[in-house]
Every structure is written in C-alpha cells, then in structure tokens.
C-alpha cells in the first residue's frame, strides 16, 4: 500500500510541475524571445533598400527598438523607430506582433509601419534557436512594391544585439544585403 501511495503521490507532483507549462502553448513557443524583451538602441548609417528611405549610407541614424510581452505573454510586440542623427527627424517607424499559429505551430508575424511617407504591411515567420533568430518576411507598400527578405538577429551576451537584413528581393530583383547593425540594451 505504501508503494501505491508513493506512486500516486509522485504522479500528482509531476503532474502539477509539468501542467503549468502545458496550458501555456503560446508562451512555450515564444519564450525564446525572453532575451529580447526590453529597449535597445544603436547608431548606424541609413540602409536604403526600402521604398521611402534615404539611400544607403546617405544619413547617420539612431536606431531604437523595444520588445515587450502582450496579453499575459501570449504574443511579443516589437516597435522600432529610426531617427536621423539629430534625434528628432523620423526616418521610419513600425510594429511587429509575433504570435503562435495554432494550426501550423509556427511563430508568425504581422507588421506595419511607414518608411518615410510610404505605408507598408507585412507578414512572416520566425525561427528561434537559443539567442539566434531568423525572421523570413514579405512586405508590400501602398504603392505596390513587393519585398521579401530575411533578418538574422543574434544576441551577444546580455546587452548586445547584432542584426542584418539579407537575401533581399524587391519586385523579383535581388538587391544587396544591408550592412550589419549593432544595438545595445538601454
């Protein structure tokens, strides 16, 4: 009887320990975003590439990015803003929401924003492997410019983020990758 009681008690304890994660599939899928949560900032040169942006290298920029949890950790929001070096003039702004697609079990994204005066929307898919992130994205502007690209993002230590925009195809034409950017946690 003692063995039976111990066995039942073990099953109950293990059930309680692991049940906490089983009922949070969105968080379980997105918990790899935890190292990104917070505010990030860096300086670079303009990347060009997207309709409405200054040409590559034409301007010094300040890059701001904030990641936060939404709705009881069921999604992650990224907001970004690129400013001219004066810290006042906005070059581009945008928001991305990352969620778990319950059908495919993939992390998917929906994005929108402005590059200069040009409005755009997009969607994509994220792959998270520890502190390495790959975002495959498709976007279209209000003017019909279609762009697909990949962002590779790596967290280096606790406070440094490196990202680059690669494999850019715009209206079925391959264009050069953007220079790597480095942001630091604020």
Predicted segments, located by residue:
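Bacterial N-terminal signal peptides
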Residues: 7-16
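Hydrophobic small-molecule pocket/channel-lining residues, especially in calycin-type beta-barrels
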Residues: 20-186
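Positively charged n-region of N-terminal signal peptides that target proteins for export
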Residues: 1-4
